[in-house]
């Protein structure tokens, strides 16, 4: 069995919105400890991983199941969530469906057919990064939007004094500079200077669910995948993005 109740359907909608921009489908690995999932995007450029501990739920009951979901259908359902709706997720093993229920003055129930997909063997690799930056999510998102004016990729740079997001087009360029003592920087731990380029569309998709007040943890090195971590309503999201190879 599986049944989980969350206080805010709208908050979980942000999670589904974010991962559905990168993935078409996903297999949720459910057990008594919570829910885990990881998958590569179809182009094998990005890895998406999420963890929902049982403490993120108001109520939670589960034994071990793999629940395959079409994320486009899940997104359409979650878009129907209202501001004060509670979210109930429950597995109907007899009908092989996941019931998505919004509870407020009444109950609205949607039943999603399960996909026959196995849990991904792809996991977030254990990589030791030389640099870790913690930055306010809204500041990072705004810098990416600025970069999007001129380029389809960004160069992320870090040294012991600052974190820089640089974009350069054919004629124009822009730069967002966050000094170590900037109000946007929570912490800047740099062991070696780093500079790497990344696809901007992927980065913007990865931070789609970030709201004002959220903190993003950025792991950066030279010629290493970029790693991003942040949480939405107790759901822990991790993304890896391959660096852009300069021609």
Curated annotation (Swiss-Prot):
Signal peptide: none annotated. The keyword DNA-binding applies. InterPro entries: DNA_clamp_sf, Pr_cel_nuc_antig, Pr_cel_nuc_antig_C, Pr_cel_nuc_antig_CS, Pr_cel_nuc_antig_N. Keywords: DNA replication, DNA-binding. GO terms for molecular function: DNA binding; DNA polymerase processivity factor activity. It comes from the Archaea. Gene3D superfamilies: 3.70.10.10. One of its GO terms (biological process) is leading strand elongation. Pfam families: PCNA_C, PCNA_N. PANTHER family: PROLIFERATING CELL NUCLEAR ANTIGEN (PTHR11352:SF0). Belongs to the PCNA family. Homotrimer. The subunits circularize to form a toroid; DNA passes through its center. Replication factor C (RFC) is required to load the toroid on the DNA. Sliding clamp subunit that acts as a moving platform for DNA processing. Responsible for tethering the catalytic subunit of DNA polymerase and other proteins to DNA during high-speed replication. This is DNA polymerase sliding clamp. It comes from Methanocaldococcus jannaschii (strain ATCC 43067 / DSM 2661 / JAL-1 / JCM 10045 / NBRC 100440) (Methanococcus jannaschii). The gene is pcn.
């Amino acid at each position: 069995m599986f049944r989980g109740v969350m206080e805010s359907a709208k908050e979980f909608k942000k999670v589904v919105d974010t991962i559905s921009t990168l993935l078409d489908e996903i297999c949720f690995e459910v057990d008594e400890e919570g829910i885990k999932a990881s998958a590569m995007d179809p182009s094998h450029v990005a890895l998406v991983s999420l963890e929902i501990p049982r403490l993120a739920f108001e109520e939670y009951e589960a034994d071990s199941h793999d629940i395959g979901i079409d994320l486009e259908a899940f997104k359409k359902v979650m878009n129907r969530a209202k501001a004060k709706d509670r979210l109930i997720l429950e597995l109907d093993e007899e009908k092989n469906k996941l019931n998505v229920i919004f509870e407020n003055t009444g109950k609205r129930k949607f039943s999603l057919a399960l996909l026959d997909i196995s849990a991904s063997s792809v996991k977030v690799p254990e990589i030791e990064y030389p640099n870790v930056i913690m930055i306010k999510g809204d500041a990072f998102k705004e810098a990416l939007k600025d970069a999007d004016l001129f380029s389809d990729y960004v160069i992320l740079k870090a040294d012991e004094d600052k974190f820089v997001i640089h974009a350069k087009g054919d004629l124009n360029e822009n730069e967002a500079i966050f000094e170590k003592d900037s109000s946007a920087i929570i912490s800047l731990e740099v062991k070696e200077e780093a500079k790497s380029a990344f696809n901007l569309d992927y980065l913007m998709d990865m931070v789609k669910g970030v709201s004002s007040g959220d903190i993003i943890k950025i792991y950066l090195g030279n010629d290493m995948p970029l790693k991003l971590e942040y949480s939405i309503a107790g759901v822990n999201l991790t993304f890896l993005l391959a660096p852009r190879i300069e021609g």
